[in-house]
């Protein structure tokens, strides 16, 4: 696995692979990798001949009071994980390499509606930052396919819409969330949890599963169901950002008529914000 830091070196390496007729996959990350990221790279290696991973902690997608400065940087460990997972090329640009003209006047990519509400409501500007950096990486690498985790369900929906609306010839693949044995979705931010918070954290996914079971049993009063689950989570020590049942494609609030729905949650344990979701096909 080669590691490059400049756009020039990235494009040269990708051009060599493409000249050899290789199918190219991209897996963008912010580093501090766990086995969920490794699963994305492994899947990319199964679907393509040349896997490019990126590690870039993107300032544009962090709010003023978020964890940009403290987000863990673990490059050596990340390189080892990527190598074992089947990555061929790692791109680790600096902020100056990604935004050579500064960020104040950077052209931004905005995906309306899908970026609003849910995480977009509590993290204004976040998805604009995500869409902008992902579109830049897509232009830099020009992959045949790109793989993202379904844990960030709203992010995946935003990227799918961006690719569709901007006619990018890239196949977007969502991979199922990788979980710890107790059900907690793997996240780079789980390391912020204290021991007590880590023990409590699986209750978020348990509440989502219970919500899905009740919906599958025929419950149609979503508001009452969500209210009871919010109370349950608050009693377990969570501070709720949102708990919603949405149409799985449009992310608009689900009704009794929606067959494909997604249950989405974001909640704080202490200062750590956890997100999770579950896609459900109603009979």
Swiss-Prot record:
<feature type="active site" description="Proton donor">
    <location>
        <position position="37"/>
    </location>
</feature>
<feature type="binding site">
    <location>
        <begin position="186"/>
        <end position="189"/>
    </location>
    <ligand>
        <name>ATP</name>
    </ligand>
</feature>
<comment type="function">
    <text>Catalyzes the condensation of pantoate with beta-alanine in an ATP-dependent reaction via a pantoyl-adenylate intermediate.</text>
</comment>
<feature type="binding site">
    <location>
        <position position="178"/>
    </location>
    <ligand>
        <name>ATP</name>
    </ligand>
</feature>
<comment type="similarity">
    <text>Belongs to the pantothenate synthetase family.</text>
</comment>
<feature type="binding site">
    <location>
        <position position="61"/>
    </location>
    <ligand>
        <name>beta-alanine</name>
    </ligand>
</feature>
<feature type="binding site">
    <location>
        <position position="155"/>
    </location>
    <ligand>
        <name>(R)-pantoate</name>
    </ligand>
</feature>
<dbReference type="InterPro" id="IPR042176">
    <property type="entry name" value="Pantoate_ligase_C"/>
</dbReference>
<keyword id="KW-0436">Ligase</keyword>
<keyword id="KW-0963">Cytoplasm</keyword>
<comment type="subunit">
    <text>Homodimer.</text>
</comment>
<dbReference type="GO" id="GO:0004592">
    <property type="term" value="F:pantoate-beta-alanine ligase activity"/>
</dbReference>
<keyword id="KW-0067">ATP-binding</keyword>
<feature type="binding site">
    <location>
        <begin position="30"/>
        <end position="37"/>
    </location>
    <ligand>
        <name>ATP</name>
    </ligand>
</feature>
<keyword id="KW-0547">Nucleotide-binding</keyword>
<protein>
    <recommendedName>
        <fullName>Pantothenate synthetase</fullName>
        <ecNumber>6.3.2.1</ecNumber>
    </recommendedName>
</protein>
<dbReference type="GO" id="GO:0005829">
    <property type="term" value="C:cytosol"/>
</dbReference>
<dbReference type="GO" id="GO:0005524">
    <property type="term" value="F:ATP binding"/>
</dbReference>
<feature type="binding site">
    <location>
        <begin position="149"/>
        <end position="152"/>
    </location>
    <ligand>
        <name>ATP</name>
    </ligand>
</feature>
<dbReference type="InterPro" id="IPR003721">
    <property type="entry name" value="Pantoate_ligase"/>
</dbReference>
<feature type="binding site">
    <location>
        <position position="61"/>
    </location>
    <ligand>
        <name>(R)-pantoate</name>
    </ligand>
</feature>
<dbReference type="InterPro" id="IPR014729">
    <property type="entry name" value="Rossmann-like_a/b/a_fold"/>
</dbReference>
<dbReference type="Pfam" id="PF02569">
    <property type="entry name" value="Pantoate_ligase"/>
</dbReference>
<keyword id="KW-0566">Pantothenate biosynthesis</keyword>
<dbReference type="GO" id="GO:0015940">
    <property type="term" value="P:pantothenate biosynthetic process"/>
</dbReference>
<comment type="pathway">
    <text>Cofactor biosynthesis; (R)-pantothenate biosynthesis; (R)-pantothenate from (R)-pantoate and beta-alanine: step 1/1.</text>
</comment>
């Amino acid at each position: 696995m080669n590691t490059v830091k400049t756009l020039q070196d990235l494009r040269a390496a990708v051009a060599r692979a493409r000249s050899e007729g290789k199918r190219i996959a991209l897996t963008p990350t912010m580093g501090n990798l766990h086995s969920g990221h490794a699963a994305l790279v492994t899947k990319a290696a199964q679907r393509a001949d040349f896997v490019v991973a990126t590690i870039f902690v993107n300032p544009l997608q962090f709010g003023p009071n978020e964890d940009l400065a403290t987000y863990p940087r673990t490059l050596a460990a990340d390189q080892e994980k990527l190598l074992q997972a089947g990555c061929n090329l790692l791109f680790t640009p600096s902020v100056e390499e990604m935004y050579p003209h500064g960020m104040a006047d950077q052209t931004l990519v905005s995906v309306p509606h899908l970026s609003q509400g849910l995480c977009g409501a509590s993290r204004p500007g976040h998805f604009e930052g995500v869409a902008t950096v992902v579109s830049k990486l897509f232009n830099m690498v020009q992959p045949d396919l790109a793989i993202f985790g379904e844990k960030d369900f709203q992010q995946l929906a935003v990227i799918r819409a961006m690719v569709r609306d901007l006619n990018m010839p890239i196949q977007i693949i969502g991979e199922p969330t990788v979980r710890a044995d107790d059900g907690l979705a793997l996240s780079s931010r789980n390391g912020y949890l204290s021991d007590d918070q880590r023990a409590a954290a699986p209750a978020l996914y348990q509440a989502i599963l219970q919500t899905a079971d009740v919906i599958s049993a025929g419950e149609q009063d979503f508001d009452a169901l969500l209210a009871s689950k919010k109370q349950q989570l608050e009693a377990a020590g969570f501070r709720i950002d949102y708990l919603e049942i949405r149409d799985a494609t449009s992310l608009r609030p689900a009704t009794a008529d929606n067959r494909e729905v997604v249950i989405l949650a974001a909640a704080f344990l202490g200062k750590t914000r956890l997100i999770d979701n579950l896609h459900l096909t109603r009979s």
